[in-house]
Amino acid sequence: MTTTVSRTAAIAAFLIAQVTFACAAEIKVYATIGVKHSLEDLSAKFENTSGHKVAITWGTGAALAKRILAGEQADLLVLTRQGLDTLSKEGKVAPGSERNFASSTLAVGIKKGAPKPDISTPEAFKAAMLNAKSVAYPDPAGGGLSGVYFAQLAEKMGFAEQLKSKARFPADNFAGKLVASGEAEFAIQQKPELISIEGVEILGSLPADINVTTVFSAGVSKDAKEGGPSIELLKYLESPEAAAVFKRDGLDPPPAAAKAS
């Protein structure tokens, strides 16, 4: 009797596994590097519980939006609010699928154990930048919000000219790596992007008066081939489990006033 029950259970488990495998999909995700550490973790957990596979193409929100507009196909778009808005206006996002799931501000990263200058006020931050030997940040030419904003801020605060000889642009857009390797004294980027780099610690966020909040959003592509599974992943990104991972990695909840459809 026990043997029969065991065999029946084994057969049932096998059949369930076959059905799950047959229904499993590969979700093609285009995602901003601003949430890379969190999304890698969450995607692995989602794969384990759903049976689906998640294939992620990384880039800046602006660069990925351009690729979609140029005709590339994805199922789920995980971008900055600005990037998703650009695609939504061009009819590239499924109506009603957009969700804001996290936000972040700019921070300053230093190598662990390095001196910690004061950056608590705009004046102190400017002084730190002027005294720095080198500053790493994403190349503004790449269109990433961190690099574009910091370049504009330097111009506005009057240290753009001095910054030119100190600027270090990371090839992969992760400014913290140049600090960790000793190639730069400071790194300016989204807080979660700095936290994800081993050997880097957060000196502090930019003063509130000169900082900017970036909202991270997701939406199902209008041309999605795996719409149902994409919605499953989208809902998972709004779950309490996902919120805990985002918080762990230095992300904040999205502002209540941020746009979502």
Give the role of each language-model region.
Residues 9-20:
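Bacterial N-terminal signal peptides
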Residues 23-62, 66-70, 78-91, 95-104, ...:
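Exported/periplasmic ABC-transporter solute-binding proteins
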